[in-house]
From Swiss-Prot:
Binds directly to 16S ribosomal RNA. It comes from Rhodococcus erythropolis (strain PR4 / NBRC 100887). NCBIfam families: S20. One of its GO terms (molecular function) is small ribosomal subunit rRNA binding. It comes from the Bacteria. This is Small ribosomal subunit protein bS20. One of its GO terms (cellular component) is small ribosomal subunit. InterPro entries: Ribosomal_bS20, Ribosomal_bS20_sf.
């Protein structure tokens, strides 16, 4: 346990941020998985609908600093390519 007051506070804020980031990353993984399942099933309409919502979640996570902007761009690109193959 830290002795310095500011470090005690940083431990608390880091834990709160970790839990928040964990939640966002979990929802991202779920969104990507559901898109991939729709794409694998060949459901064009549902896949395109999920592509939009997943892209939005990726952009939001990148703007909040949960994931790097380049990682979001790479994932969006891969998902778009998968959608275009349908």
């Amino acid at each position: 346990m830290a002795n310095i007051k500011s470090q005690v506070k940083r431990i608390r804020t880091n834990e709160a941020a970790r839990l928040r980031n964990q939640s966002v990353k979990s929802s991202l993984r779920t969104a990507i998985r559901s898109f991939r399942e729709a794409a694998a099933a060949g459901d064009k309409d549902k896949a395109n609908e999920l592509l939009v919502s997943t892209s939005r979640k990726l952009d939001k996570a990148a703007s909040k600093g949960v994931i790097h902007a380049n990682q979001a761009a790479n994932k969006k690109s891969a998902l778009s390519q998968a959608a275009n193959k349908l």
